[in-house]
């Protein structure tokens, strides 16, 4: 059996927690070759999330969770320097509270998404890459926008971290069709489950699986940690104000982690356009 760590950071998600936990149980059922451990970091919730976690997860043997009040500001899905720093800190907390050395894979799964566990189990089982003799270092879903905005619901949600090339700062919708044609990998698991594997520069998309080796300390190199940086961004060509009107740019932590993986030699990054998740 292989071991996978599933990480989730949570704040004020009471309306989504039952769905989130139920989907994770379904995911376990579709990944029989893996032992699952769940690492959860919650902070500053005021809507009953803390109480739900204590009631439902306290006695679970395969769950590790922290619940703290640190007084940070809560943001929505916006690009903010402060938010990026906080998210990187929270995601790293999920790794710090376990022994990472016992895991083969690490998955980050957001609490406010909906997905078909049978289809998305591919991200853990990685059968499409296996057809090509590939063990992916990063393998993600394709996240769609909320149905609350029907006109936008067919578009990619994670435009910050999903990038076709190193030079992109966000998702390039204009070249998406070309990207789909040129990056598709020839795999076929039958019927519609084919020609859905693509290469790209970086990704997250609310459900992302990582090679755990990158997070482990080795004698030859230090481990990858969640962080933030201006690395790779030419700010002389970009006038950018964040959500709080600050003139600055910190690249998304979910894009930075991909670049850090690449620098350590973990450069097999894929996305599966059949593994659809819906942001709620």
Feature names for model-found ranges:
Residues 2-8, 24, 36-40:
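Hydrophobic targeting segments
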Residues 13-29:
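Short, well-formed alpha-helical segments that are part of the catalytic scaffolds
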Residues 13-17, 83-91, 249-254:
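Phosphate/oxyanion-binding active-site loops and adjacent basic polyanion-contact surfaces
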Residues 14, 41-51, 70-72:
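A conserved acidic beta->alpha catalytic loop
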Residues 52, 56-103:
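Active-site-proximal specificity loops/subdomain of glycosyltransferases
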Residues 101-114:
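Short beta-strand-to-loop acidic/aromatic patch adjacent to the donor-nucleotide binding site
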Residues 113-230:
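Conserved catalytic core of nucleotide-sugar-dependent glycosyltransferases
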Residues 189-280:
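C-terminal catalytic/acceptor-binding lobe
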């Amino acid at each position: 059996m292989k071991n996978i760590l599933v990480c989730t950071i949570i704040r004020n998600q009471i309306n989504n927690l039952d769905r989130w936990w139920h989907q994770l149980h379904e995911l376990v059922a579709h990944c029989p070759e893996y032992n699952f451990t769940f690492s959860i970091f919650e902070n500053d919730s005021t809507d009953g999330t803390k109480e739900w976690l204590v009631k439902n997860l306290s006695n679970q043997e395969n769950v590790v969770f922290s619940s703290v009040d640190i007084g940070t500001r809560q943001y929505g899905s916006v690009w903010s320097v402060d938010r990026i720093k906080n998210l990187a800190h929270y995601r790293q907390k999920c790794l710090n509270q376990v022994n990472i050395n016992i895991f083969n894979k690490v998955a980050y799964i957001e609490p406010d998404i909906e997905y078909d566990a049978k289809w998305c189990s591919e991200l853990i089982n990685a059968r499409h890459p296996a057809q090509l003799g590939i063990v992916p270092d990063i393998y993600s879903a394709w996240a769609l926008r909320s149905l609350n905005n029907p006109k936008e619901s067919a578009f990619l949600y994670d435009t910050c971290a999903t990038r076709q090339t190193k030079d992109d700062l966000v998702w390039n919708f204009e070249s998406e069709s070309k990207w789909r044609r040129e990056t598709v990998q020839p795999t076929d698991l039958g019927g519609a489950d084919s020609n859905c594997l693509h290469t790209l520069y970086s990704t997250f998309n609310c459900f992302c699986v990582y090679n755990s080796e990158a997070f482990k300390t080795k004698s030859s190199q230090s481990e990858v940690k969640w962080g933030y940086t201006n690395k790779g961004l030419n700010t002389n060509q970009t006038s950018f104000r964040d959500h709080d009107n600050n003139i600055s740019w910190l690249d998304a932590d979910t894009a930075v982690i991909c670049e850090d993986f690449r620098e350590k030699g973990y450069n097999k990054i894929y996305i599966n356009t059949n593994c659809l998740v819906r942001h709620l």
